[in-house]
Amino acid sequence: MSRFHLPLAAAVVLVSCLWSANALVRPDGVGKLPALGWNSWNAFGCDIDDAKIMTAAKEIVNLGLKDLGYEYINIDDCWSVKSGRDKTTKRIVPDPAKFPDGIAGVADRIHDLGLKVGIYSSAGLTTCAGYPASLGYEEIDAQTFAEWGIDYLKYDNCGVPSNWTDAYTFCVPDPGSASTNGTCPDNENPAPQGYDWSTSLTAQRHQRMRDALLGVEHTIFYSLCEWGQADVSAWGNATGNSWRMSGDITPSWDRIAAIANENSFLLNHVDFWGHSDPDMLEVGNGDLTLAENRAHFALWAAMKSPLIIGTALDGIDPAHLEILLNKYLIAFHQDPVIGRPAYPYKWGYSPDWTFDPAHPAEYWSGPSSTLDGTLVLMLNSEGSRQTRTAVWKEIPELKDALGRKGRRQTGFRVTDVWTGKDLGCVRDHYTVTLESHDVAALLVGKGC
């Protein structure tokens, strides 16, 4: 068992779990369910200030997103003075031109709205945009963030000095660095068989901040952003509340499909207290079609990934807002009784268990206590209109269901998750025609 600083040592425990070796469990419940919120980076990059952050916070409330559970307003990179830390206190200094009331002032106003606030740093000497980062200053920064009232830390992997670079290279099977079966044949520096990546320098850099956060009296959700490096799925759950499993997302279907494919092979690590993070949402960004926006959100929700909105909320397209406000998908995502995500039960376009960045698994299912039924997704990963059919006897949660006379149940009440329409008693299967890159989302309920 890891050793933690005394203030929270008795309040935070590492417990053995089926889905991972360990998990961070807090008595206040922070981190049990995947995070819901908003982040500044995908919308604004470095062009942030007090006004933009507060506008996002107010829109989370005004648009009804807060009512569904969206709660974190996260300030990403570029919030501090770039020239360096305070020479006396060694603290990171908020940029007074961007945040005249400091980060604490913003946090106070966000808290007044009934929301929580997040901040950004990196496990290196500088952030990805070249601002002061936290390696070597973990305890100072954790204490500073706690005093400011910070509730969430996104912790990146930039600015790493050579003496903190891993001895080996882990295979992150992103397109461009992997073969079609998810391996990295060109990796010239693989770890020896049986190597424990939780002892790697990447893991140690992130564990140092974990210990510092656990040493303060204020709970801070810890989001690891290490891009899937160093086999983070094996140690992320003992280090943070969520962990990035790949490189960055972009507002393009090719990238969204590739990340969904990659994450579909990592879902055995996901349950209460620990969530694999396929990066922030791009709903509302770029040239994604409405179908692609829907599929992106549905897959992220079904995988119980953090749902962190990444678009400007003032002036958001009503159709995109409707996606973010889908009460069925949020209810599945925030289930307080069932922690496991939906899993692929059939790949569809490709043979089962095929690692294909262009065509992720198309058929997904997962049980839900909040919906009192099973969530079923059918994806069209192809570039043209196609039909997809969900066959009840193929779905793990439904295939063994018994009717009143002990016979296999063949009919179920079905609801269209996108429209809320009751589709009635559907027997044996349900077929739908989908536009390119769209997804059908069904709630399959009681037998009939």
UniProtKB/Swiss-Prot annotation:
Sugar attachment sites: 163, 181, 237
Disulfide bond entries: 46-78, 128-158
Enzyme active site: 156 (nucleophile), 248 (proton donor)
Signal peptide: 1-23
Classification via PROSITE patterns: ALPHA_GALACTOSIDASE
Enzyme class: hydrolase
Residue positions binding substrate: 226-230
Gene Ontology terms: cellular component: extracellular region
E.C. number: 3.2.1.22
Catalysis performed (reactions): Hydrolysis of terminal, non-reducing alpha-D-galactose residues in alpha-D-galactosides, including galactose oligosaccharides, galactomannans and galactolipids
Coiled-coil boundaries: none
Keywords: Disulfide bond, Glycoprotein, Glycosidase, Hydrolase, Secreted, Signal
Classification via SUPFAM superfamilies: (Trans)glycosidases, Glycosyl hydrolase domain
Family: Belongs to the glycosyl hydrolase 27 family.
Purpose: Hydrolyzes a variety of simple alpha-D-galactoside as well as more complex molecules such as oligosaccharides and polysaccharides.
PANTHER family: ALPHA-GALACTOSIDASE B-RELATED, ALPHA-GALACTOSIDASE/ALPHA-N-ACETYLGALACTOSAMINIDASE
Protein's name according to its UniProt entry: Probable alpha-galactosidase B
Organism of this sequence: Aspergillus clavatus (strain ATCC 1007 / CBS 513.65 / DSM 816 / NCTC 3887 / NRRL 1 / QM 1276 / 107)
Originating gene: aglB
